[in-house]
């Protein structure tokens, strides 16, 4: 078989790349080792609950997200529709002491909040005049302590990074993990001053598509990947094994075993990988081991994700995006999302759906706990932290383990990015994509895919 462009991986990045290229008339083929398309995105429906076993939400942080939804609603016949969270979901909670407390959303609440010390509240007034950092590899924790103070690290930065990266603020490097924050200081000298100036910058109509709203799809995120996989049809091959890619003159040869055990070959002009870095040594054997080691130096946070549903909340109402738990509070969960407060149809009418996140880089051992042990944690948190009375118990508990859940953009990132660029220049037609670069969120994945497709059309 011959194709213009071969894409490895049928997750969000791979499907978005393939769909965009195919919609522009390019001949594409997608290879996927799993027996289903969608990658980590997987929506489940059970007993009145609609829950995710991978990503739960995204943010419309770039126009590409909005543009993709506009297209997919058309090609899916209305089956894929954007759903954004209500204003109530802007409320974010942080656990301190014995309860969840709202993260400040304005000057008044910032002054009154018990989350931060009085000293750090005064300290933040001087943030616009603090000296700009000089270490390009400064961690998020170091940067936040220097500009904001320890209590802001403990009760804002640390839980935020637990929620996004399941990571450690003292190892995540700011310019890779939070490049927008890094650029505020570097370009404007201050977070506060930079945010104010950015807000005043003129925006085009396309810029305004990036509303920053929390999003899903009506009925769940699988409707996004299903819309693209249905559009692509037999251009996706599932259940492949033993994939090897090798350069051959100005083209590429991919060999693999299909689900029936037959040996197959594809000849392509361009190859795009969208899989995790840990897969690359096997599928790109032509890259020297010393160079591949620099690409494959990426650490992933392990994660246990647990969907917890209750059919009748007995009047308890959580109108917020979710609650995050600082490391210093020594709880067994990193955070809890409230999907039924954000999106329609996620729980029965009188019920609620929660998503617990457990583990991360600081507590990788949680992945080894049995279902019984994790269920005990779920029930304890349900009563102690979510404040359900003892007579009310979860009606749904579904446990999902992810060994390689979230890439950690640590000090090794610079070497990895440089090596990826070097390999792409050395081997014409090779594109190494996926969440090993350019951001981990769904919006990052969509933008990377659209950018690659734009470059190849």
Predicted regions and their residues:
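Conserved flavin/dinucleotide-binding core of flavoenzymes
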Residues: 104-108, 318, 336-457
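Active-site/ligand-binding neighborhood in enzyme catalytic cores
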Residues: 126-245, 251
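Dinucleotide-binding Rossmann-like beta1-alpha1 core, especially the glycine-rich loop
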Residues: 47-131
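Mid-domain catalytic core of redox enzymes
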Residues: 240-354, 361-367, 384-385
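Glycine-rich FAD pyrophosphate-binding loop
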Residues: 22-46
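N-terminal Rossmann-like FAD-binding beta1-loop-alpha1 element of flavoenzymes
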Residues: 3-30
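Conserved Rossmann-like nucleotide-cofactor binding loop
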Residues: 13, 36, 278
């Amino acid at each position: 078989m011959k194709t213009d462009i071969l894409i490895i991986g049928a997750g969000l990045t791979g499907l978005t790349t393939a769909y965009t290229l195919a919609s522009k008339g390019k001949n594409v083929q997608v290879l996927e080792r799993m027996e289903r398309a969608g990658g980590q995105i997987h929506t489940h429906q059970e007993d009145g609950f609609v829950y995710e076993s991978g990503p739960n939400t995204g943010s419309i942080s770039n126009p590409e997200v909005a543009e993709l939804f506009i297209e997919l609603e058309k090609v899916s016949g209305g089956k894929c529709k954007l759903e954004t969270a209500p204003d109530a979901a802007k409320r974010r909670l942080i656990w301190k002491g014995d309860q969840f407390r709202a993260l400040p959303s304005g000057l008044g609440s910032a002054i009154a909040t018990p989350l931060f010390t009085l000293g750090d509240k005064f300290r933040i007034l001087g943030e616009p005049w603090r000296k700009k950092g000089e270490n390009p590899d400064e961690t998020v924790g170091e940067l936040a302590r220097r500009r904001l103070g320890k209590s802001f690290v403990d009760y804002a930065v640390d839980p935020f990074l637990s929620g996004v990266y399941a990571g450690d603020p003292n190892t995540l490097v700011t310019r890779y993990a939070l490049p927008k924050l890094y650029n505020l200081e570097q370009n404007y000298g201050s977070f506060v001053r930079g945010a104010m100036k950015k807000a005043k910058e003129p925006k085009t109509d396309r810029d305004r598509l990036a509303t920053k709203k929390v999003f899903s799809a009506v009925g769940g995120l699988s409707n996004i990947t299903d819309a693209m996989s249905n559009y692509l049809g037999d251009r996706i091959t599932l259940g492949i094994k033993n994939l090897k890619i090798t350069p051959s003159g100005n083209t590429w040869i991919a060999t693999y075993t299909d689900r029936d055990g037959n040996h197959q070959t594809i000849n392509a002009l361009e190859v795009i990988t969208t899989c995790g870095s840990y897969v690359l040594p096997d599928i790109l054997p032509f890259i020297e081991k010393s160079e591949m080691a620099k690409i494959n130096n990426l650490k992933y946070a392990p994660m246990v994700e647990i969907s917890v549903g209750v059919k009748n909340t007995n009047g308890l109402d959580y109108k917020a995006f979710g609650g995050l738990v600082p490391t210093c509070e020594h709880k067994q969960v990193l955070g809890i999302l409230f999907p039924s407060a954000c999106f329609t149809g996620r729980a029965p009418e009188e019920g609620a759906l929660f998503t617990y996140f457990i583990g991360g880089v600081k507590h990788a051992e949680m992945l080894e706990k049995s279902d019984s042990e994790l269920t005990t944690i779920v029930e304890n948190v349900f009563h102690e932290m979510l404040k359900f009375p003892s007579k009310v118990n979860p009606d749904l508990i579904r446990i999902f383990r992810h060994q390689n859940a979230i890439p950690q953009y640590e000090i090794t990132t610079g070497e990895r990015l440089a090596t990826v660029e070097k390999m792409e220049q050395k081997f014409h037609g090779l594109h190494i994509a996926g969440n090993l670069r350019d951001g981990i969120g769904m919006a990052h994945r969509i933008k990377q895919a659209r950018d690659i497709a734009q470059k190849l059309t």
